[in-house]
Amino acid sequence: VNLQEEIKRIKQIMGLLSEEEQKSYESKPIILIGPQGTGKSTTAEALAKKLDIPLIPTDMLMVDEKYEELCKNEPGVEVKITRDKGLNYSSNKEYEFCVMNKIFDDYSNQKVVLDVGGSHANWDDNYSKRMQELFNSTPNIFIFNVSNDEDETYEFLKKRREGRGEKISPENEDKFRNIISDLNNFYRGTQKISIIDKDKKSKTTDELVDEIITKLT
């Protein structure tokens, strides 16, 4: 057995894609975005591992010192990050917009998995068109939901989160509903990934990963 065949065999055992399969989609980011509770981040991690490409969690980069330094002095940006006694972070949309642009500057022509927080679904008129252009620069953007029925999605995810011991305040309930609605509207026309099957049962992480891989272009 030659070395290349052995490497291919080991990759198959590990559940990784072959080089031929790797080349079958564009050198662009794969974006996963969705509200909390959809299993998006778990799926993103598993997808990156299976494709053997880097995982880039955008929420973490919002508090990364590199992006803070790049954006903190930009016009209109407000950001405060303290790291001495745990992490405290507050910012405005101008900062988030700046960081997302810098992330795309860094990764727009790379095969990476971008795990994008659901809070990045809402952008006011000053930024919405430019954000859509940014996200549409890759053909592989996947929105995690339960169904196109926003109430069904909300109730399913609320029940799942409460089942994990989370307490959702009335204020956060409204915010959560808005994120679900914003995702359905802001990213209209992109590929949707339902986290439940036809029998209304939750799909496994492996099932979600395989579904995404079959839809890569």
Predicted segment positions?
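A glycine- and Lys/Arg-enriched "phosphate-lid" helix/loop adjacent to the NTP-binding pocket
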Residues: 135-186
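Hydrophobic anchor at the beta1->P-loop junction of P-loop NTPases
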Residues: 32
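Conserved lysine of the Walker
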Residues: 40
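NTP-dependent small-molecule kinase module
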Residues: 23-25, 46, 50, 110-111, ...
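ATP-dependent small-molecule kinase phosphotransfer cores
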Residues: 60-127
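Hydrophobic positions on the alpha1 helix immediately C-terminal to the Walker A/P-loop
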Residues: 43
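Intrinsically disordered, compositionally biased, charge-dense segments
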Residues: 1-23, 187
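P-loop (Walker A) phosphate-binding loop of NTP-binding proteins
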Residues: 35
